[in-house]
């Protein structure tokens, strides 16, 4: 005779009689002696209690010791992923982009400057012109800088006596390029007095409905400027990653660890760089340790992300040297063949967990780099302890990534390649370019590839793709029962958030199956 069912009202009380919570703790899951190395596909996070809307989930997180982002999304410093356009929109959408260094130092610095000039608070060094500047010269400047509002001072310098303002409306229909701006400029532009706050300045722009607010001192000398376009960007991109002091967009860039990279970094810092990545496939080297020491002595305010690493021993050396953040991953990227060719690396889930467990004790945020293919992988990387997730392949093929689209077999594609591919190594010559220095191959007569070249399908703009990732990650945290990335980390460590190991058949079950055909649309 079967036992009578228990009183349903005592279900919660009965649950307490179990010796442990359902599923595995993160420590049990990541026991390499039992399960070996794990990737993101090898496990799932178990659901928790949902008692809040997904829109309430905060995705604020640390990039480095001093830099906080509103989203954990970071674009990779690859020459087919991140240049100025990608870095601009990654920052506007709450993340940050790291501009690649497979180009000349001046080209890279120019891209950093373009990001920093895209959005400002007070523009303390506005580009000014003199009354004798011609309309033709202004048109050239408009094409060069991407904007057309230029203050006019007596000597064409700032600070300098303000005499007017030239905007696109002043020159839009002028065909005579030889005219000087003193004949066409607005002679009484709207001004504010030096010392007003950013909030007060923006309020003047709203009330006057003008495009520019010129800030002058008591003697009428131009000292700075506010732009209405920046005010609109503030409204359209509320999560934007900005400097707390300048209100400019945050921008990162990568450099190598050879001597020439020191001068490259000087140019990047002059352009306004906020954070630098030391770009090495194997970050635990004397070259990187020496570079960290030099940067800390030369640019003490510049944040440094070191790597790549996959073990806590690697991490310990870089943390002790003064790294402000770590980049985790070796051979897990979709275009990377390091594990295959070099027999060196680590499954990404195991690498992220072990390095983060160590680094987080020292307050050093970690970035999971490689192996991320979807929102679920992002969630798992963050649950294992990383603070941010770097994406290469996920952002390749977007409108903002470098390169031109081409068609093959009816598909619209863009090139995507690993920085360890032969193509990338030979882009600017073998000696000391970004790819050869990243893989310590500057002096090699025969190059050994650690990456491949390929193509990816057009993904559209990240202006749609990043919000899709953002909303998806919020829903994922809601399912787990965590209202923030901070609480996700805490609840993983204290055992509240549980995991389950997936067998091969479980992975098949968790994907689309038993359909004749289907269309997989991720977002509209």
Curated annotation (Swiss-Prot):
UniProt lineage: Eukaryota, Fungi, Dikarya, Ascomycota, Saccharomycotina
The gene designation is IMD4
Q: Give yes or no: UniProt keyword Repeat.
A: yes
What family does the entry list?
Belongs to the IMPDH/GMPR family.
Provenance organism:
Saccharomyces cerevisiae (strain ATCC 204508 / S288c) (Baker's yeast)
Q: How does it assemble?
A: Homotetramer. Seems to be able to form heterotetramers composed from more than 1 of the 3 IMPDH gene products (IMD2-4).
Q: What does this protein do?
A: Catalyzes the conversion of inosine 5'-phosphate (IMP) to xanthosine 5'-phosphate (XMP), the first committed and rate-limiting step in the de novo synthesis of guanine nucleotides, and therefore plays an important role in the regulation of cell growth.
- One Gene Ontology MF term: IMP dehydrogenase activity
Pathway(s) per entry: Purine metabolism; XMP biosynthesis via de novo pathway; XMP from IMP: step 1/1
Q: Which domain of life is it from?
A: Eukaryota
Phosphoserine occurs at which residues?
125
Any idea what this protein is called? Inosine-5'-monophosphate dehydrogenase 4
Please provide the record's keywords in A-Z order.
Answer: CBS domain, Cytoplasm, GMP biosynthesis, Metal-binding, NAD, Oxidoreductase, Phosphoprotein, Potassium, Purine biosynthesis, Repeat
Name the Enzyme Commission number(s) assigned to this protein: 1.1.1.205
Annotated GO CC locations: cytoplasm
